[in-house]
Amino acid sequence: MVGILLRVLAIVVVLFALAVIAGPFLISSEPREGLASNTEAAMAESRFVRIPFAGTAGLAVHYLEPPTDAPSWATPFLLLHGFTFNAWTWQPALDAFAARGRVVAYDQVPYGLSAKPARADWDGPNPFSKEAAITQLFAVMDALDLERAVLVGNSSGGTLALEAALARPGRVEALILVAPWVYVTRPTLPATVASLPQMRRLSLLIARKLGENGPLLDLSYADASAITDGRRERFAIHARVAGWDLAWGELLSLSLSTPVTVSEHLVQVQVPVLVVTGEMDRVVPVDDSRRVAGQLPDASFVVIPGCGHVPQEECPDQFARVVGDWLDARRIGASGR
């Protein structure tokens, strides 16, 4: 009897191992069909610029830029969205920034309507790496004639803003970090493991779930019932563009082996910083944002009551007041009053 049980157990173990090894190969790696180009999916307010990137023929970057009556000398603002979001996360706040200077919100590659390069599209650095995101940020600034700017980053966009300020402080006037994703507790895998075919297929599956179902949008609001149909439409606009799922899968696969280490360098940030968070943030704990502000040499910290992870969307009036008061106190840009 014991021998039979051991044989059955051995068979179960073997079947489980085969499922783990072979199961991910059941996930299709073919891109979603019947989708449009980024320009075909564009909205009336959409703009595009092509930036150089090593090993490619250039990358198309989608951005939003409202008109401004601010004086030409006013410092411009460059707005950086978070993971799975896009430039439209800043739409409710664009006019408030435009009252103080030129403002540009762009889709980081491969989000929104920006380029979604497939592996065959590049022969050089990975366009989805942290280093690539920094390079692309400054390439956008160059292409749009932004010599120096205030970087405004939400969530992982705040991480990118910090990395950019550390890399090229001479081009950053100040930072506004909205619930920055700095103290990350997620595990990372060795590159050899993350690059296994099975892991790449699983990354693709997760990317599709995140991109098609949009769970992070609801999680980012204190009150998800406030999310309009129009907001959901723009959040998911990437899913209209051919190759979006493969590009997101590539980014997610790479992130599995890329630790977030910017917290180790906060004391080196040389510019003034405003850290803002929502009182009811369920993505980045309020204490994490407070801790970021405490580690920076020159930072202010504000909590906006009743808001979640994206106060610029959910509480735009309060957000604009907090940011405006800080900019006025620091005498950065033109006054919005």
Predicted regions and their residues:
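Conserved alpha/beta-hydrolase catalytic His-Asp/Glu region
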Residues: I27-S28, P187-A191, I206-H265
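Active-site loop/oxyanion-hole signature of alpha/beta-hydrolase fold enzymes
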Residues: P52-A57, L64-A70, Q108-V152, R321
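Conserved HGGG/HGGXW glycine-rich cap/lid loop of the alpha/beta-hydrolase fold
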Residues: P66-K116
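Flexible "cap/lid" loop of the alpha/beta hydrolase fold
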Residues: L166, A174-L205
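Gly/Ala-rich beta-loop-alpha elbow adjacent to hydrolase catalytic centers
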Residues: G153, G157, A161
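Short beta-strand/loop motif that positions the catalytic acidic residue
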Residues: V269, V275-T277, D281
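Catalytic active-site module of serine/aspartate enzymes centered on a nucleophile-bearing elbow/loop
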Residues: D298-R337
